[in-house]
Every structure is written in C-alpha cells, then in structure tokens.
Curated annotation (Swiss-Prot):
SMART domains: Haemolytic. It comes from Acetivibrio thermocellus (strain ATCC 27405 / DSM 1237 / JCM 9322 / NBRC 103400 / NCIMB 10682 / NRRL B-4536 / VPI 7372). Could be involved in insertion of integral membrane proteins into the membrane. This is Putative membrane protein insertion efficiency factor. It is a peripheral membrane protein.
Length: 71
C-alpha cells in the first residue's frame, strides 16, 4: 500500500513538475524518476528508495551518465 503511494507521488512529479523544466536535465536513461518508480516497484520502499537516492546523488555534471537500469 505504501509502495503505491510513493509511486503515485513520483508520477505526480513526472506529470506536473518535471515538464516545467526548460531543458531535460537527467543524465541517465531511464530518467531518475522512472528509475525510482522501477526500484520501488521491484524492491519496495526502503531498498528501492535508497537505490533511487543513490541514483539522484550521482546525477551531476561531473558524472558521465548513460544507461543505468534497475538491477
């Protein structure tokens, strides 16, 4: 139940907040928000949330980015 709520919040971000950015800013594929949805859906809120946090912390100009799916 909590897992669905977290995914719903991330989808709200994708739908209403992310489009407000003028340029695409995620260096990864899939995007960090989609990665968070995949991780929470697969591993649950605690482990998936930790994986998503690590991914977001890697998303900066000095990291090359690229293809990084949930494993």
């Amino acid at each position: 139940m909590f897992r669905r709520w977290v995914i719903y919040i991330i989808r709200l971000y994708q739908r209403w907040i992310s489009p407000l950015k003028t340029m695409p800013s995620c260096r990864f594929y899939p995007t960090c928000s989609q990665y968070a949805i995949d991780a929470v859906g697969r591993y649950g809120v605690i482990k998936g949330g930790f994986m998503a946090l690590k991914r977001i912390l890697k998303c900066h100009p000095f990291h090359p980015g690229g293809y990084d799916p949930v494993k």
